[in-house]
Amino acid sequence: MDLFTHVIIAYLISFGLTLGKSPVYIAAGSLAGGLPDSDILLMPLARRFPLLRHHGITHSILGVTIFAVGGAILGPMVVPGANAWLLLLFMEIGGLVHILLDGFTHFAVPPFAPFSNVELHLDADRAVNGVTLAMSLTSFFLLVYERNTVPLADWLITGWLLLVTYLGYLVLRGVARYIVGKEMKKEGYTAVIPTANPFHWLLVEEHEASGSWSTRFAQYTIGRGIRSPQKAIGVEAPPPATLPVTTANEAIQLSYRPAMQRSRWLASTYRYATVNSSANGFRVHWFSIEFTVFGRAPGIRVDLDARTGEMHLERSWFRLRDLANPTLR
């Protein structure tokens, strides 16, 4: 989830546990709710030390405990009179909330690293969801603005209402994920991808072996079933070597491996491609169907010369509407 949502939910849970009466420990919990994402500062070291990657060791029980211990030691120096044990408790809770929220999405986190590589990902929400981001920004404004401008009783009511709203949202997402999981098995798919709308999901099945790859997916709407035609795409190994390239399928076959080599991240997500004709041949858009943000998807644009087979590759964010893929909007 986005950083604002992590901090706000950790804040509200700390608020609920203290009944809104201990600002120091509420602040400690909300700070800890955001600290695991400080691993973004360690990215230059991640190539040498993989545990320092984003969603690595800082997103584990060990990592958040280290943060909590540090807060318990430094906290009383910053806020005289603060109880170190309570600081430890609320910072541990805030950090664990961060892990659980990330695992609730289609990102994966290693809660038991470095002792185990087992990952947690429930695929119940998007990692970056415009709905929750808007909720969090609004919540942040209300909590900060009202703190010193309205009576304390009104501020407490706002806090409780926001806490109930967020918990209700998470319950809605969890129940929807359970329902769509049953439909996934019924329809013969192997995975689900959440969209921004908790009632719309993608059902996915992917196969990859000996250089060949294929995927199929369809949009599922809770209460209505599969509402769009299934989309499918596949690549054989080895790709065709004949020139000139005359069909869209040949363009897909030839561009697949260069595109995946250009973006290892794209190669590790569920992906799809669309093909359009161009002046010299074909333009192929390979993009992720798993990580879409505000109607755009990251991917690789491949301009393929039909006569020579030469390719020009460029990273970009594509508007899904431009790619004529209404399934993914």
What are these regions (language model features)?
Residues 175-329:
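C-terminal regulatory/interaction regions
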Residues 1-216, 221-233, 324-328:
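N-terminal membrane-targeting hydrophobic helices
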